[in-house]
From Swiss-Prot:
The gene is E(spl)mdelta-HLH. This is Enhancer of split mdelta protein. Disruption phenotype: RNAi-mediated knockdown of the protein in the type II neuroblasts lineage results in an increase in the number of type II neuroblasts. Simultaneous RNAi-mediated knockdown of the ETS protein pnt restores normal neuroblast numbers. It comes from Drosophila melanogaster. Keywords: Developmental protein, Differentiation, DNA-binding, Neurogenesis, Notch signaling pathway, Nucleus, Transcription, Transcription regulation. Residues 151-173 have a biased composition (Basic and acidic residues). InterPro entries: bHLH_dom (IPR011598), HES_HEY (IPR050370), HLH_DNA-bd_sf (IPR036638), Orange_dom (IPR003650). A motif (WRPW motif) lies at residues 170-173. Transmembrane segments: none annotated.
Length: 173
């Protein structure tokens, strides 16, 4: 018999009552984990700049992070023409790759006794790789450009072309 004034809980209500504190603990643990990671990054950066950090509270960590992100955003607004870091890294890589290919070519042309056929093959391969890198970048650049559908002409659908030309479309079935 139930005690007067006491309600029975359904299984769902009991499940929620038990799991809510567990979920809250996990959420807090996750927040603290990322705050600790931010703290480590901030301390490393401040040590590299010669600043001594005695203690950082959670509010300090968040404040420094927000200030850093605002500074980065202002820097992007102030220099809109500066290439993104990925592009700078790609340009540096390409310049280093080209320099290395030049040095390989120089060695093959100046050191006697090296197989010229192998050297020619190697230089062709290096050239093909450099060309492929440039083509991949162009494809990525085209994919990132916004598409203006108003500027494009309407193309006929494949069915309209089939009707007008009488050609059959190959199908695997």
């Amino acid at each position: 018999m139930a005690v007067q004034g006491q309600r029975f809980m359904t299984k769902t209500q009991h499940y929620r009552k038990v799991t809510k504190p567990l979920l809250e603990r996990k959420r807090r643990a996750r927040m603290n984990l990322y705050l600790d990671e931010l703290k480590d990054l901030i301390v490393d950066t401040m040590d590299a700049q010669g600043e001594q950090v005695s203690k950082l509270e959670k509010a300090d960590i968040l404040e420094l992070t927000v200030n850093y992100l605002k500074a980065q955003q202002q820097q992007r607004v102030a220099n809109p023409q500066s290439p993104p870091p990925d592009q700078v890294n790609l340009d540096k890589f390409r310049a280093g790759y080209t320099q290395a290919a030049y040095e390989v070519s120089h060695i093959f042309s100046t050191v006697p006794g090296l197989d010229l056929k192998f050297g020619t093959h190697l230089m062709k391969q290096l050239g093909h790789q450099l060309k492929d890198m440039k083509q991949e970048e162009e494809i990525i650049d085209m994919a990132e450009e916004p598409v203006n559908l108003a500027d494009q002409k309407r193309s006929k659908s494949p069915r309209e072309e089939d009707i007008h030309h009488g050609e059959e479309v190959w199908r695997p079935w």
